[in-house]
Amino acid sequence: MTTLTLVLTAVGSVLLLLFLVMKARMHAFLALMVVSMGAGLFSGMPLDKIAATMEKGMGGTLGFLAVVVALGAMFGKILHETGAVDQIAVKMLKSFGHSRAHYAIGLAGLVCALPLFFEVAIVLLISVAFSMARHTGTNLVKLVIPLFAGVAAAAAFLVPGPAPMLLASQMNADFGWMILIGLCAAIPGMIIAGPLWGNFISRYVELHIPDDISEPHLGEGKMPSFGFSLSLILLPLVLVGLKTIAARFVPEGSTAYEWFEFIGHPFTAILVACLVAIYGLAMRQGMPKDKVMEICGHALQPAGIILLVIGAGGVFKQVLVDSGVGPALGEALTGMGLPIAITCFVLAAAVRIIQGSATVACLTAVGLVMPVIEQLNYSGAQMAALSICIAGGSIVVSHVNDAGFWLFGKFTGATEAETLKTWTMMETILGTVGAIVGMIAFQLLS
């Protein structure tokens, strides 16, 4: 099948999905499944491969996310009901002031997300944003956009995030320069796409705290201290961070290395934190065991719907990936004769927009530009700058084929149209600012 046909099929699928969800008001899960199957048929995918691809997309997306979102939902709900999240929110508001709350939550997202996957950081911190919104009476948009921007900036640009680590290794970039240029991209990107954009778009889009988030239930005990509350939030971050540090100093394959790998896996880290929150906080406050289990059960109800829609988004992404549209589009764009830094950004952005996966966009862009770059003998510093250009392109224009789009919408209660105005624009601004920093760095280093 020709490149043009594949691209038209992908674009048509996205437009049809937007129509079904936003105009026809079809449930997002059903619409995603219908369009995924249609995209497989029209892209020329063998009939016996379509169902297998859909299963692969669902399993690949939920294999990690299901456990993270479920445990994270219970953990966050326990912290909320015991007043721990309120303590953190109140302390942050006292330290930064109500007028700078959006900068505080953005910075928290940027720092806390360093050792974590994007989704893990969001499920751990979203309850803090809800609590801050309740205390300040602020439009939720003004707080969740900076939070998501901070987490997204760390995930896209900062080592040891999975994406920048992958890019640095694939591009043979200098890790020191990768850290420096990544910081120069992440910090202004977070500020512009987070607090500044969130403040602006909050005039036009209003989101409210979800209905299931009410005043904390404190049982018969006292409000936990700020120090203990913060330590609970930081516990999974520390466990994951220990794994990252151990990978540098402990011999791979040793017993100690395997233990650090086990303890620092997000599943283990969040499970441990969840158990500490239940037995070390809720029950010590005097909360009955039945009440604690009821809270955990209630936390899983909205999580189930969130996971189904995200999984369906993964199905759509996988169908587009397996159709071959990414490499076909990339090869067409490579021959356009653009400057190499711009080419890196445009390639990653094009694949991202068509397929939805930031990781696939990064890998596709690297695979297409490396044969050209290797002949030019760029330094490790220049390769780091080009890596940041690719990272920026890989996160722009997040829409209905990206799991992050549905994660934002379902956690915040935003409609699809509101998610496009808030989340999609935030990601686009963040990626563009980061890529511009990468392009400037490449020019200065040339």
Curated annotation (Swiss-Prot):
GO CC, alphabetical: plasma membrane
Key words of the record: Cell inner membrane, Cell membrane, Gluconate utilization, Membrane, Sugar transport, Transmembrane, Transmembrane helix, Transport
Transmembrane segments: 2-22, 27-47, 59-79, 110-130, 143-163, 177-197, 226-246, 262-282, 295-315, 331-351, 353-373, 388-408, 425-445
Localization of this protein: Cell inner membrane
One biological process term in Gene Ontology: D-gluconate metabolic process
Membrane topology: Multi-pass membrane protein
Membrane topology (Cytoplasmic): 1, 48-58, 131-142, 198-225, 283-294, 352, 409-424
InterPro entries in the record: Glcn_transporter
The keyword Transmembrane belongs to this UniProt entry's keyword annotation: yes
Pfam families per record: GntP_permease
GO molecular function, one term: carbohydrate:monoatomic cation symporter activity
Chief place where the protein resides: membrane
Superkingdom field: Bacteria
Periplasmic topological domain: 23-26, 80-109, 164-176, 247-261, 316-330, 374-387, 446
Free-text function comment from the UniProt entry: Part of the gluconate utilization system Gnt-I; low-affinity intake of gluconate.
NCBIfam families given in the database record: gntP, PRK10472.1
Protein name listed in UniProt: Low-affinity gluconate transporter
Organism: Escherichia coli (strain K12)
